[in-house]
Amino acid sequence: MPIVQVHLLEGRSTEQKKMLVSEMTASICLALEVRPEQVRIILSEISHGDYAVGGELFSEKKS
């Protein structure tokens, strides 16, 4: 049973997450020759204040 964990910044819509897990499941099934009901996907959303790039919090990053 494949278990995949995805970390992503908060802000994606439910529809986007549904599409993501659907596409990932299809790819995993194809690559690993498993059934969709065997695939587990964990989405972990990270707030912008809990993520840093180049030593700067993403929430404080200038565009």
Regions from the PLM with identified roles:
Residues 2-63:
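A domain-level signal for the structural core that forms small-molecule/cofactor-binding pockets
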